[in-house]
């Protein structure tokens, strides 16, 4: 299974926000979209990502004034990205190595979707369930009851 097949199942909609938006707006948008991260876009270019974790860290560091700060002040830059052809094992290694929970997916340098660690786990579990069902069916077929 690869990134493209995961996106085909989950969809390619990505919640985005501008770098000049307030952290309050980002938090509201995260809640409204029920997502854990927003991709930060400027003039159709991927410039960063802001996650719930980024907001919690900023709140811990700066206190209440963080709500009026801009997304670009606390977003993660220098992103690790995935490509549509990346396989699930490669993706899991990247996410683990770089300790990220959300990874933008690019197609020809343009944003094509986003994959979360939850998406990876769900699809891995689906694969394992299918494999277990196939093995069970093979066993049952090869061991008829008398």
Regions found by a protein language model. Name each.
Residues 16-34, 81-99, 106:
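The conserved cystathionine-beta-synthase
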Residues 21-32, 61-74, 109:
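Short, charge-rich amphipathic segments
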Residues 1-12, 51-81, 87-96, 117-146:
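Tandem CBS (Bateman) regulatory domains
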Residues 30-33, 38-54, 95, 103-120:
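A glycine-centered beta-loop-beta connector
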Residues 1-47:
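A positional/architectural concept
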């Amino acid at each position: 299974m690869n990134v493209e097949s995961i996106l085909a199942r989950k969809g390619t909609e990505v919640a985005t926000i501008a770098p000049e938006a307030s952290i309050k707006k980002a938090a509201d948008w995260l809640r409204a979209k029920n997502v854990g991260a927003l991709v930060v876009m400027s003039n159709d270019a991927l410039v960063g990502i802001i996650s719930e974790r980024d907001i919690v860290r900023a709140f811990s560091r700066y206190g209440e004034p963080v709500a009026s700060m801009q997304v670009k002040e606390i977003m993660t830059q220098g992103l690790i990205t995935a490509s549509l052809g990346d396989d699930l094992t490669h993706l899991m290694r990247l996410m683990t190595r770089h300790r990220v929970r959300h990874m933008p997916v690019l197609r020809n340098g343009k944003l094509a979707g986003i994959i979360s660690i939850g998406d990876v786990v769900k699809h891995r579990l689906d694969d394992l369930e299918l494999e277990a069902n196939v093995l069970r069916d093979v066993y049952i077929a090869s061991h008829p009851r008398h």
